[in-house]
């Protein structure tokens, strides 16, 4: 694995040239096999008919109808504040002065993206040396996020009055999220420990209440990941936004063309383009096969949560696009995708419960730039109902079925007159096993998960003068698995 300090960041001049000056064109991928759209009537109560593009997302409580009594909340995992040395165009914290405008961009972006809880994960070069209670950048009007009377984060009041919660963490060789204290009293020792990824480092972050995750799964090996999970790592990234764009990471680790997306995004980013600027991520929205494969392999034996890492730094493209906002704004990147968790209605307002739901794998990765999905559900119906993230003995569930309820597009989602095409692909131990909505009788032990794909015909009005190349199948939702283990596993 390449050390974090050696991992390249995107080249600003290269990106600016590719994004703003190259000729127009769509992506080069061809449509994937797809099934008919789910035609169930919508249960949400938003407006009907075409809806304009919106730079912000409504609060979760307004976006997601309850599913079997479960409420949905949006979480962001892997995000950088001015405490990261490479954030804010490399000027997050210079000569003892914090970049306040960049911090305000981050706070506003989280609110605009409808985020409920952000696990901010700063690099240790600066963060390890800050007092723990400075990691969440509290400002006037904020309230401490408390657990047992101790502050473990921050609560920001967004402009619409809803709360946004912030928990601190670190991203280096490990990515502990939700730190409740620094691992050591001495800042230098913090820095050293945060740069390690062995069992002692995992124990150290667990001892201060953090959930140990692994970022940049694409750069890892299965044997080392397995050892880290056995030592206490809770989850891994199945998608990382930095890797999706970075030419070197695409080429070396993802097996993708280095920079074919650069020319493709001109309809969204060029001054003469006619497509919605927010949609330029479609050019890189592809399954990150190495990361997903490692995650699947781990889940054949172990319980491993999968998340998507936003990895936003606001440090790549300061040039404004046609909407007047810099190309890599926090707001834009945070709107693209999130990690949804399901919690009981009684815990709908409890960020600590959302954290527990993520740790349990009662969660899914959702690419909400494709639209807000509502009504989807995946569960095992057997001797009892098994939810996402659960593990149970196969012998306890004879005759069980995997019930797959496909998503619908929320009524308030940006859309034209056309309906999306939605498909459900069921994977068992990482291999496609079934397809389609409905009940799928289980045929043996395995880790069962679902990927919902969408061909976004509903986005045609926002895709410029030549929308056809963009109307292909994209991953919309990755659920975490439900695991049924054989005897002795």
Question: What are these model-predicted stretches?
Answer:
Residues 1, 22-48:
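Ser/Thr-rich, Pro/Gly/Ala-heavy low-complexity intrinsically disordered linkers and tails
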Residues 4, 130-133, 225-227, 319-320, ...:
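Short secondary-structure transition/capping segments
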Residues 11-23:
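Bacterial N-terminal signal peptides
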Residues 46-72, 76, 80, 84, ...:
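C-terminal functional module detector
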Residues 52-260, 272, 276, 285-293, ...:
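A metal-dependent hydrolase metal-coordination microenvironment
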Residues 262-266:
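Mixed-charge, low-complexity intrinsically disordered segments
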Residues 270-274, 278-282, 303, 361-362, ...:
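Flexible, glycine-rich surface segments
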